[in-house]
C-alpha cells in the first residue's frame, strides 16, 4: 500500500528546549552533587527527559536549543522582557556548559540564535 511506504520514509526530528528542560529539572529535583561537590541535579533531570524522549519517540534526528545570554533583541525591543524574572541561580548556570558538552559528545547539534 502506498501509505505504508510513505510512512516508512518519513523521518522524525525531536527538538529539546535545553534551557526549559534544565530549569525544570533544577527546580524539580533535590540538589545532587558529585564527589567533587559539583551540583548536577539539572544535568541528571535533563538526561532523564532526553533519554525518555529518545526511547519513546525513536527519532531519526535530535537537536537541542539553548537561549543566548541576555541582552538579546527582545530585551532591546521590549524593555519589560523578563524584567521581573529573578537572576538564574549560579548552581544552575554552572550546569549549562556541562550539558552542552554531554550533548556534543552524543553528536547532538546545539542551536543558539538571537
Describe the residue ranges of each PLM region.
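Intrinsic-disorder-associated, low-complexity terminal segments enriched in Asp/Asn/His/Tyr and depleted
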Residues: 4-5
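Noncatalytic, basic helical substrate-engagement surface that gates or grips nucleic-acid strands
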Residues: 8-114
Amino acid at each position: 500500500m502506498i501509505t505504508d511506504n510513505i510512512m516508512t520514509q518519513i523521518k522524525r526530528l525531536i527538538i529539546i528546549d535545553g534551557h526549559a528542560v534544565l530549569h525544570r529539572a533544577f527546580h524539580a529535583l533535590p540538589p545532587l552533587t558529585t564527589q567533587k561537590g559539583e551540583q548536577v541535579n539539572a544535568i541528571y533531570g535533563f538526561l532523564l527527559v532526553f533519554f525518555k524522549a529518545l526511547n519513546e519517540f525513536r527519532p531519526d534526528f535530535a537537536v537541542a536549543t539553548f537561549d543566548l545570554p541576555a541582552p538579546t533583541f527582545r530585551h532591546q525591543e521590549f524593555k519589560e522582557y523578563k524584567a521581573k524574572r529573578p537572576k538564574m541561580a549560579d548552581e544552575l548556570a554552572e550546569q549549562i556548559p556541562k550539558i552542552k558538552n554531554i550533548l556534543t559528545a552524543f553528536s547532538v547539534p546545539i542551536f543558539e540564535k538571537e
